[in-house]
């Protein structure tokens, strides 16, 4: 029975289409929150790859991240490049590049390489950068675990050292 009291009718594929349409009607932040709940709830620690590589997240993730930066008082004009700290955060970087482009803004991306401490991507020398990570634990929030702006002396000093050595401003 449904909420209306009637028995559902139609083929099973219609129910799937309805649930997809319900998801599409959500605001972008709500879509991302729904995906996070599906993949993270009940897990004490998650890399978020199941979310960042999901096709539904790919369409909204970049805009949500840029909006989160703006909500924190930053403008897209405050940074020149965005970098991925882990493999799971690479789609986040790509999504931000595409979201910025759709807004008429230029934003480059890069990936941190920890095998040979360096970056992969356009030069970040003299550029202002934001680093992204895609880890979530019960004791953190999405905004603080997935959006990391490095400062001198924090726990990511290796990452900061590589970026600083390449002449970027974090």
Task: Please state what every model-predicted region is.
Residues 1-170:
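PRPP-associated nucleotide enzymes
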